[in-house]
Amino acid sequence: MAAAAAVAKSVEAGGEPGGGGGGAWSTVSRSGRSSYSAGGGVGGGKVGELAEGLAGVEIGGERRLDKYDIPVEVSGEDVPPPADGFEAAGLVEAVLRNVARCGYESPTPVQRYSMPIALAGRDLMACAQTGSGKTAAFCLPVVSGLVAAGGSGIGHRERSSFNRAAAKPRALVLAPTRELAAQINEEAKKFSFQTGLRVVVAYGGTPMYNQLRDLERGADILVATPGRLVDMVERSKVSLEAIKYLVMDEADRMLDMGFEPQIRKIVERMNMPRKSVRQTMLFSATFPPEIQRLASDFLSNYIFITVGRVGSSTDLIMQKVELLSDGEKRGYLLDLLQRQSVGVANSKLQQPLTLVFVETKREADSLRYWLYSKGFPATAIHGDRTQQERESALRSFKTGLTPIMVATDVASRGLDVPNVAHVINYDLPKSIEDYVHRIGRTGRAGKAGSATAFFTESDHSLAKGLLELMTEAKQDVPDWLVQYAERPYYGGSSYGGRNRRSGGGGNRFAGRDFRQGSGGGYSGGGGGGGYSGGGGGGGYSGGGGGYSGGGRGGGYSRGGRGGYSGGGGGGGGDPYRASAPPPRYYPSYPMGTADINASGWD
């Protein structure tokens, strides 16, 4: 890459010409990563201010992005062709140097298609697999565009009434959770290093004072959660009138979490430029039709891209599903972790990072302490922990100090921990989409990973979706899962996810541009593909909707193994009640189930 020589030169010099000197990039030999540390020469000016927020941020090394040779569908009018590389995309030189510093050698498909569209000033809706590089796909063109436009220097700001400082960011990135906002903030800082741009993050769950101090120094790029941003705008600490770029990441998650009123208030009633003036980009792993229709209120003549099958899981993840009772989960988890530890000890490698998902906050804390008592250092992250506790838990997990993290769904989307080797669904989620996002914490950016799910009788509604996903990803499917998938389920649809607002049928993952008669677009695998000028909508259409019905008509109960017990709730009996699941046999555990349940951790 042409920027590589410039990077080497600037690293040796400990700074860049015109950048104020100061910090330096260094390579850590054990991990192959680079990190920035603020040197003694950082005393002020643009780089001095910027370096304060960047000190200690770790930059990922080579990410094996060439493995992303997956199909891409594009629909819309006058679609720019995909870029073969970062330089071909048209990024400015300062951003190219930062791309090289991060060790990115070639763009992923979502980056290859999104960057030319964004740099051309077009509105964009992008659907891509978890871990496919969505964050860089919008951060890179936004930073490049702001640098090319010049303007405010470090942190655009103005004085409002009563001499209070009001930040006037030129780019706004909305994210559903604190963790995702913090991650995007880190990425944006890496890509805007020594460009003169100032990046600020604002989210709830933590005192506002420090965030207000950051904003008073100005912000070119503001990354925020909707609730905290509304609060800051109403306090006259932020003005949205200068917004040139609006990005919504995990847009479906924000709407499902109930942020629609805040988002509409931000976009429509807080003095933000009209959609014909600003540029708007929406990124997510799923876009059901009703969310596409809602999002279209914020977009103008947009281009829709789908990278891979929306809602699918990457084939870099080896998936296993184990049939268990609730009482067997802890014993099987312990056995799984012990076998994993033995393999690591024999190979003298570092303990792999393992993410364990549970349903409740109470179970997260309980399981964490229980694992510690069994000799497995673990931490936990969930909504009841303070922001400081959550950040400390993530830091401890990322560094490997506690290589096991027990989490609720607060950590299931958007978080980028580069080296998660194993995701364990101790409790399965309620929808296939959430399952996909959970296991997407591993197998990221071209790296292989493993995912294990503990399936109980209460997870019957997920059987068909799991079967389809595992079959599509060419995984080994156990016979008992096929049997479960073939039985009708009378508890309502499991394929639309939670809180879906449309009735019946439709696409399971809805990765298709709902606009009719869209113009032609590009279609290809990974690197490019040919141009098709048809009128179709692009994207993929999944299967039909799931089963619907009355209340649950009973469930299986564990006596020995299997056996059907007709339960309360309307809906009638299961016509397949005679087909009990086949018996399973488990390895012997250091501690029996009875001992586990008697240990006081349940």
Swiss-Prot record:
EC number: 3.6.4.13
PROSITE patterns per record: DEAD_ATP_HELICASE, HELICASE_ATP_BIND_1, HELICASE_CTER, Q_MOTIF
Superkingdom classification of source: Eukaryota
InterPro entries: DEAD/DEAH_box_helicase_dom, Ded1/Dbp1_DEADc, Helicase_ATP-bd, Helicase_C-like, P-loop_NTPase, RNA-helicase_DEAD-box_CS, RNA_helicase_DEAD_Q_motif
Pfam families per UniProt: DEAD, Helicase_C
UniProt-listed SMART domains: DEXDc, HELICc
Residues in Helicase ATP-binding domain copies: 115-305
Motif Q motif, residue numbers: 84-112
SUPFAM superfamilies cross-referenced by the UniProt entry: P-loop containing nucleoside triphosphate hydrolases
This protein's name: DEAD-box ATP-dependent RNA helicase 52A
